[in-house]
Amino acid sequence: SRAISGHSMGGHGALVLGLRNPGRYRSVSAFSPIVAPSKVPWGEKALTAYLGDDREAWNAWDACELVKRASERLPLLVDQGGDDEFLDGQLRPQLLQAAAVAAGHPLQLRMRPGYDHSYYFIASFIGEHIAHHAEALHAAASPSH
């Protein structure tokens, strides 16, 4: 049993890996992740550099698109600082929330007022993410699972 977590671009990676690999992970969490790289300037630039101009190919690396067609309903936990300087222009967690609701995919999105994109934000809530993963891993290890 495995769990995966990350921050910012690493949060994007955690979400994408969790959603693209059904059965590999028991839980996924992210701090301030990039959730829709195909819909933000930084992501468009990066996806073009790596994958070319085929926007359809980009969907395989976009958590908002992946959550719509995920075969496994892996619970997702996302914490986002309300004062993050990248919130509106690059991160846009509301897009993931909308996609998850539309797909019936479990997502707990917690907006944290007063927090930014920093280490202090992660340090403030990492214990809750560890508990999230521990609960999922424990449930997977129980004989009734």
Language-model segments: what does each one mean?
Residues 1-145:
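Non-catalytic cap/lid and distal C-terminal segments of serine-dependent acyl enzymes
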